């Protein structure tokens, strides 16, 4: 059994840092109308919360702008489909996107290389084909899979990247040479595993702790086979009664052998691990809880008790 705490964490952070009350606006009224229309046409308000949750899980995300029939579109790209090639202290300016396709029994990889040059943004498309998903394969013309796609496309006069990379506010202590982010739970993997071990053990408690009644085998119904031998049979679907043979059958009484459940011990262990996880993530103690014994709190109490959680959400924003 698993608690899926990693997803719970990412969903919680996503709702804290982006909600329906969020507003995106531009000072210039003309551009503001354009931006609002682009966001609306690309289902930004519906798709971004889920996309943001994945970004917390994967260590980042990219929103890429492209044209489709002269209409501005947004592509929500997971961090594992992007590799940066050039960056500065502010942002990633160049990078390669990778997309996988399957057609006619072949596996294709389309690489989209974004570069900033003196005359504008240059985008190069490179297509590779392979018989196996595991191999990069050989280079083939882009037209083999995309007849209308050009090898190179230039957006003259554009001096800003046509994509925006963002990442969680978690220092990357695993890869120092790349400006990439880490999943918010990257340094809490051991704790997440421990939580799942405890939760799995709790589930096993209910399986192993089912009612068990020991009975002498003489109490089991019997039938006679074709040879006239007595054969005892037992309902294999019955999980309550357990039959035993004994040398001294009269001393073997019907007895309840049900084991008591160790629910309290498991819950306390889960609470401890969840508090450790909250500390590792930067949440306030008790933010992640297995049960709720605190009752209703006022807004002032919530703000006081969860100041670390509120501070963490502001950092990610």
Residue ranges and their predicted role:
Residues 145-308:
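Extended, charged amphipathic alpha-helical segments
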Residues 1-93:
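Extended, helix-rich architectural segments
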Residues 52-57, 103, 115-116, 154-155, ...:
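A general structural signal for short secondary-structure junctions and capping/turn motifs
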């Amino acid at each position: 059994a698993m608690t899926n705490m990693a997803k719970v964490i990412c969903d919680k952070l996503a709702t804290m840092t982006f909600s329906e009350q969020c507003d995106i606006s531009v000072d210039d009224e003309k551009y503001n109308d354009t931006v609002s229309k682009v966001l609306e046409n690309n289902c930004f308000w519906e798709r971004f919360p889920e996309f943001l949750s994945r970004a917390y899980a994967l260590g980042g995300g990219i929103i890429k702008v492209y044209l489709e029939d002269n209409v501005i579109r947004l592509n929500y790209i997971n961090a594992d489909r992007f590799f940066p090639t050039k960056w500065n202290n502010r942002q990633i300016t160049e990078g390669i996107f990778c997309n996988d396709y399957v057609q006619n029994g072949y596996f294709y990889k389309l690489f989209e290389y974004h570069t900033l040059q003196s005359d504008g943004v240059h985008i190069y498309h490179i297509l590779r084909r392979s018989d196996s998903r595991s191999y990069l394969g050989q280079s083939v013309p882009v037209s083999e899979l995309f007849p209308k796609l050009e090898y190179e496309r230039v957006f003259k006069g554009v001096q800003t990247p046509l994509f925006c990379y963002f990442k969680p506010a978690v220092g990357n202590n695993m890869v120092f040479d790349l400006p990439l982010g880490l999943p918010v739970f990257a340094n809490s993997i051991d704790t997440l595993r421990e939580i799942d071990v405890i939760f799995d053990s709790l589930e096993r408690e209910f399986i192993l702790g089912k009612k068990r009644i020991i009975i002498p085998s003489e109490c089991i119904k019997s039938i006679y086979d074709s040879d006239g031998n007595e054969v005892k049979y037992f309902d294999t679907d019955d999980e309550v009664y357990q039959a035993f043979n004994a040398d001294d059958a009269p001393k073997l009484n019907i007895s309840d052998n049900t084991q008591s459940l160790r629910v309290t011990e498991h819950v306390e262990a889960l609470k401890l691990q969840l508090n450790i996880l909250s500390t590792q993530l930067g949440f306030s103690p008790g933010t992640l809880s297995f049960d709720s014994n605190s009752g209703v709190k006022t807004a002032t109490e919530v703000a006081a008790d969860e100041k670390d959680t509120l501070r963490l959400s502001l950092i990610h924003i």
